[in-house]
Design a protein with these regions (language model features):
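Concave beta-strand-loop units of leucine-rich repeat
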Residues: 2-61, 65-107, 111-124
Length: 124
């Protein structure tokens, strides 16, 4: 049976390293991928139904594959965003983003909010 209709994926702490197997999974709504050793989330770009994205404790620096999703919850704590305020440009978030441990300061939050479509609560 095909997994292409998969809506929820939980692989926390599995050190999978790559999301290539998720390419083309357009029905995903929730991904729990914390602590998986990920550098790229590019295969998530076809999952425009994503609402809940848990990517804490990885090595992600590019969030652009999530453009086009309407995100409700996103955990990005302890990744490699390195204080890059432009990393959020074009994302749509109607909910919150947890982004502590990525080099952001309180004074960065207003600018980051201005690059996001929607109403996002930001937590550092």
């Amino acid at each position: 049976k095909s997994a292409r209709g998969l809506r929820f994926l939980g692989c926390n702490e599995l050190q999978i390293g790559s999301l290539d197997a998720l390419e083309g999974m357009t029905e995903l709504e929730t991904v729990c991928l914390a602590g998986c050793g990920l550098w790229s989330i590019q295969p998530l770009s076809s999952g425009k139904k994503l609402r809940n994205v848990y990517l804490g404790r990885n090595n992600v620096s590019d969030l652009s594959p999530l453009i086009g999703c309407d995100i409700a919850e996103m955990y990005l704590d302890l990744n490699k965003l390195n204080g890059n305020s432009e990393a959020f440009r074009g994302l749509t978030v109607h909910g919150f983003i947890v982004m502590n441990g990525n080099g952001y300061a309180q004074e960065d939050l207003e600018y980051i909010r201005s690059t996001i479509n929607g109403e996002a609560d930001l937590e550092i």
